[in-house]
Amino acid sequence: MSSPIRIAVTGAAGQISYSLLFRIAAGDMLGSSQPVILQLLDIPESGKVLDGVLMELQDCAFPLLTDIIVTHDPMIAFDQADIAILVGARPRGKGMERKDLLQTNGEIFREQGRALNQVVKRDAKILVVGNPANTNTLITMKNAPDLSPENFSGMLRLDHNRALSQVAMKLNQPVSHIRKMIVWGNHSSTQFPDLSHAEIDHQKVIDLIKDQTWVENSFIPTVQNRGAVVIEARGLSSAASAANAIIDHMRDWIFGTRDDDWITMGILSDGSYKIPKGVIYGFPVVCKNGGRKIVQGLEISPFSRTRLDIAYDELTQELDSIKHLLL
């Protein structure tokens, strides 16, 4: 059996982690033969809840779970971690936009970036989930200057999965048949779920739907606003679906995307698709051998261009308000 992989998870006492940790320990993320060590971080106020999560993980008797470390110190949680999943953040409540969380959560991710810079493995894969995820990814990255930008990504996989699901329901097709979906931009209501390149069995989804009104007036706003609708229905933000998206994101990043397909990942812009450098932006990427590359050469229509730029403009506004948190 392989040596254990160390996985740090922040916000370990929270809702998303409660849906995530047991799946990681069961092998859903790294496979049925890969042992893991969970290094769990949360704030001291979460104490008894985190103790309860620890007891439940122990009581599952997972064969792959070699050890569990519980701490309130990011230096301990991130020490020699191979994977760091940064879930912990102040949650978004009813009527609250992600931009309202920028200041509070920005401080959290600055501290965690500095800790990662000191103690995480140099080839670690670091996924930022806590909102606003794109800008928090940049804050974390900028406060870990000894690590490569290739180490970091922000999660747009939940948005990507939501888009796949809407198309699958519309066309009464299995989700697994849909390829080449993209969600451009920010993990916020300005994101642009883009069907123009999506395919089912080598047929263009847009040609199968034949309803641009549905695309513009139903599909796009449904995906953009799904998080807020879930909060309205549950009284809490998406948890199980977010945990599932984390599993999907990390599995594809580590083991590679399937042939003739790509995924959406928030990564540092390199100027592709006329998105200026310096922001974490949702791009279509392919993953291979543990790395990722932006898919190049896709045609961007005027309709799409407008929406790509709207998302970029929002990200620059977010950055303007947290510049003091960047190194």
From Swiss-Prot:
Keyword list, A-Z: NAD, Oxidoreductase, Tricarboxylic acid cycle
Record-listed E.C. numbers: 1.1.1.37
Ligand binding (NAD(+)): G11, A12, A13, G14, Q15, I16, S17, N105, Q112, V129, G130, N131
Reactions mediated catalytically: (S)-malate + NAD(+) = oxaloacetate + NADH + H(+)
Pfam family, one: Ldh_1_C
Top-rank taxon, per record: Bacteria
Active site: H187 (proton acceptor)
SUPFAM superfamilies (UniProt xref): LDH C-terminal domain-like (SSF56327), NAD(P)-binding Rossmann-fold domains (SSF51735)
Enzyme class of the recorded protein, top EC level: oxidoreductase
UniProt-recorded Gene Ontology molecular function terms: L-malate dehydrogenase (NAD+) activity
Binding site for substrate: R92, R98, N131, R162
GO annotation, biological process: malate metabolic process; tricarboxylic acid cycle
PANTHER family membership: MALATE DEHYDROGENASE
Main function: Catalyzes the reversible oxidation of malate to oxaloacetate.
Stated family: Belongs to the LDH/MDH superfamily. MDH type 2 family.
Name of the molecule in the record: Malate dehydrogenase
Species of origin: Nitrosomonas europaea (strain ATCC 19718 / CIP 103999 / KCTC 2705 / NBRC 14298)
Lineage: Bacteria, Pseudomonadati, Pseudomonadota, Betaproteobacteria, Nitrosomonadales
